[in-house]
Amino acid sequence: VLLAGGVVLLAAVGCHSKTAATPANFVVALNAYFMEHPECLFPQAPRFPYEATDPAEMKPMDALVKEQMLTTEVEPSIHVSRYTPTDAGARAAPRFCYGHRMIASIDSFTPPAQADGFMETQVTYRYTMDEVPVWAESDGMRAAFPAMAVATSGAGMGKVTLASSMAGWTVPD
């Protein structure tokens, strides 16, 4: 009788395993990953003060000036604009992160298959952005940073590989 109860308990625990290929487990894994990997305007951090001569480079920086995240100093003799973070901008500089993804739904996933020594799956998901700062919400910022505009629109979609480990599903490095 005790053995039968143990089997039932083991079966119930197995249904809620962190390693099971379920949308709920994928949501947990992706939210944990994105909490540690925010979305940023500059994936590679620029060095400040940042100097620009090309109008295409200056447009996004000027949007940050308008939002009081940067100041600009123009050197007309050498046609350079020099950008420096303001006190408010210093908190977000140098990458100017604008929040992190929160998974809204798992649309689909491939059957887990062995790859690189782990079970892996491709997950397609929808997300919204969480903790978006006020400076990232203006029309000028959206125009200057189209990828940010899409990410913060509330209708973001993504696709990622997840790998299963003893601790559950994770995004491989």
Q: For each predicted feature, which ranges?
A:
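Accessory beta->alpha helical hairpin/"wing" motif in late/C-terminal subdomains of nucleic-acid enzymes
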Residues: 71-101
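Short amphipathic beta-strand and strand-loop transition segments with alternating hydrophobic
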Residues: 99-116
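Bacterial signal peptide processing site
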Residues: 16-18
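Short beta-strand edge/turn micro-motifs at domain boundaries
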Residues: 122-136, 140-173
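Bacterial N-terminal signal peptides that target proteins for export
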Residues: 1-3
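Post-signal peptide N-terminal segment of mature Sec-exported envelope proteins
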Residues: 22-44
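Basic amphipathic alpha-helical segments that dock to polyanions
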Residues: 55-71
